Amino acid sequence: MARIAGVDIPRDKRVVISLTYVFGIGRTTAEKILAEAGISEETRVRDLTEDELGRIRDIIDRIKVEGDLRREVSLNIKRLMEIGSYRGLRHRRGLPVRGQNSKNNARTRKGPRRTVANKKK
């Protein structure tokens, strides 16, 4: 397995797919990286030379990926919470942030149901 940005990428897959194993690189970014490096998307990782891997690494070093990107996202969320914005409050309460309905659904964000016991009459 080749290591790129601290991630072992699979050898048997096409390069364009393997690059998506790095956090922060999707299909579009992977295609742009390969175009800039002058490498075919159809090439398998096992067929890449060290020179080609080096070119890919150099391009990825200029992009914010993995730990740096995760840190930036968490700092952005923390900033929203500290300034007391609506989005920050939604993050703090563990509710959907982008205006989705939360009366009936939103179970992914809210977690499992917490049932409330009935009052005796």
UniProtKB/Swiss-Prot annotation:
Assembly with partners or alone: Part of the 30S ribosomal subunit. Forms a loose heterodimer with protein S19. Forms two bridges to the 50S subunit in the 70S ribosome.
Family: Belongs to the universal ribosomal protein uS13 family.
Pfam families: Ribosomal_S13
Gene from which the chain derives: rpsM
Stretches the record annotates as Disordered: 91-121
Origin organism lineage: Bacteria, Bacillati, Bacillota, Bacilli, Bacillales
One MF term in the entry's GO annotations: rRNA binding
One cellular-component annotation, GO: small ribosomal subunit
Protein name according to UniProt: Small ribosomal subunit protein uS13
Keywords tagged on the record: Ribonucleoprotein, Ribosomal protein, RNA-binding, rRNA-binding, tRNA-binding
Alphabetized PROSITE patterns for the sequence: RIBOSOMAL_S13_1, RIBOSOMAL_S13_2
Entry superkingdom: Bacteria
GO biological process: translation
Function of the protein: Located at the top of the head of the 30S subunit, it contacts several helices of the 16S rRNA. In the 70S ribosome it contacts the 23S rRNA (bridge B1a) and protein L5 of the 50S subunit (bridge B1b), connecting the 2 subunits; these bridges are implicated in subunit movement. Contacts the tRNAs in the A and P-sites.
Composition skew (Basic residues), residue ranges: 106-121
Disulfide bonds: none
